Amino acid sequence: MDARATIHDYYDSLRHGAPLDTFFADDRPEDDAVVKCGVSERLVGADSVKQGLRDQTASTSDWAVDSRDLRVTQRDTVAWFSDDVGLAWDEGGQRHEFDTRWSGTLEHRAGDWSFVGLHVSVATDL
């Protein structure tokens, strides 16, 4: 599987309420470098990111993920991407909908592509 397919699988897993923590790399012993910034949080370190994603999966449902402009560059062991994503979900009886911008970095480790950085922000005009 290449980096683009991994990103598409992540989007599909989000849509279907499947676990997302497995898409993120484990920290290497020498660093605490895995980072995920979402619409309302910043998680640092693989353990924090993975727990945050498990909590998100447990507390949300009915995700809509509309990828509008996915761009991926892949090299031997690193890839980076950006996308414009229509994002919506249910949480606590309330529907949340945003136009978002995504960017991230994946690393090829042990035969798989894993996120080492993911940033999701709300797209607004100033």
Question: Where do the model's predicted regions map?
Answer:
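Short, aromatic-enriched amphipathic alpha-helices that serve as compact interaction elements
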Residues: M1-P19
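A solvent-exposed, acidic/Ser-Thr-rich amphipathic alpha-helical stretch
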Residues: D21-L70
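Hydrophobic residues on conserved beta-strands that form the core of alpha/beta folds
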Residues: V65-S67, S82, F115
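Short beta-strand edge/turn micro-motifs at domain boundaries
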Residues: W80, E97-L126
